[in-house]
Curated annotation (Swiss-Prot):
This is Actin-like protein ARP10. Its main location: cytoplasm. It is found in: Cytoplasm, Cytoskeleton. It comes from Saccharomyces cerevisiae (strain ATCC 204508 / S288c) (Baker's yeast). Self-associates. Component of the dynactin complex composed of at least ARP1, JNM1, NIP100 and ARP10. Dynactin comprises a short rod of the ARP1 filament attached to ARP10 at its pointed-end and probably associated with the capping protein at its barbed-end. The rod is implicated in dynein cargo binding. A sidearm formed by NIP100 projects from the ARP1 filament and is implicated in motor binding. Interacts with ARP1 and JNM1. The keyword Cytoplasm applies. The gene is ARP10.
Length: 284
């Protein structure tokens, strides 16, 4: 069964694809466009086709796919993905799970603020009991592209993303807020009983190991945060997630089946829909 479960990690600048039985992705492909649309639909199709061919699963109607998605992926993008996987490759099932939840699972926690440093922007996603707290999600345009052209001091490459001594909320756009300020804003806006468990458990994604110590110390200094984690085994967590979700017998409410898609080709799973929020219980 695990040989027919395919995991797809949709990153800000890359796509990783592999089987759930493997310890790491088999293919890592640059995806510079970031978003998915009709213009790059054919390119995405070729990525899937190449992988299905090398794994000898092209034409296998039992293939199930789990998409580890960006928290801001649109329903339109999901429809394109589903259309490719169902119409072009006749897959049996497609499920979507926010990457932030998988990173929590990889860190063996149900509660955290997950910071994902992307190419064009950075997201801060509060997770409680493995549920994204939608109304408290924030993002900043401070991403990797902003610091790529800089010549940083040793260990300080990501400093402008996380902290800015000259930052003044009155003079800056809301979407240009440094990440540490975003996290503070999230914590202050949370219900009182949720503040401590999330403030004390920060997960940071897409930071090179050489910069981890600097960022960890910065958070401890500016936020008195007790636990900073940089997940390394998200692929294994995604595999475990796939086995739980895709082996569930019955109505899988975080994904759609082939027949369901053909009955309604406009359908697309939306994690923030009420029924999808209740479905997270199956990850326990």
């Amino acid at each position: 069964m695990s040989n027919t479960i395919v995991i797809v990690y949709l990153g800000a600048n890359r796509i990783e694809i592999g089987r759930s039985a493997d310890a790491c992705p088999q293919e890592i492909i640059a995806w510079k466009t970031g978003s998915i649309n009709e213009k790059n639909r054919e390119e995405l199709k070729k990525i899937f086709e190449h992988y299905f061919q090398i794994c000898n699963i092209l034409g296998n109607r039992e293939v199930q796919v789990l998409i580890l998605e960006d928290i801001f992926i649109s329903v339109v993008e999901k429809r394109i993905i589903c259309s490719i996987l169902f119409k072009e490759f006749d897959c049996a099932h497609v499920s979507f799970v926010p990457r932030a939840i998988v990173h929590c699972l990889s860190c063996n926690t149900r509660n955290a603020i997950v910071i994902d440093i992307g190419t064009n922007y950075t997201t801060c996603v509060p997770i409680f009991d493995l549920r994204p707290l939608q109304q408290f999600i924030k993002y900043s345009k401070r991403g990797k592209r902003q610091v790529e052209s800089r010549i940083p001091l040793p260990g300080s490459l990501y400093m402008p993303i996380f902290f800015d001594e000259e930052y003044n909320s009155k003079n800056c756009e809301v979407d240009e807020t440094p990440v540490i300020n975003l996290v503070k804003n999230i914590v202050e806006s949370l219900p009182i009983d949720l503040r401590r468990p999330l403030r004390e458990n920060i997960i940071i994604v897409n930071i090179e190991e050489a910069y981890e110590t600097v960022i960890r110390n910065l958070f401890k200094l500016k936020m008195d945060t007790s636990k900073i984690q940089f997940p390394k085994n998200y692929w294994q967590a995604g595999s475990a997630c796939a086995k739980i979700l895709l082996h569930y017998k019955g109505s899988n409410i975080v994904g759609i089946e082939r027949d369901e898609f053909y009955n309604n080709p406009h359908i697309a799973p939306d994690w923030f829909d009420y029924y999808f929020r209740t479905g997270v219980k199956r990850l326990q």
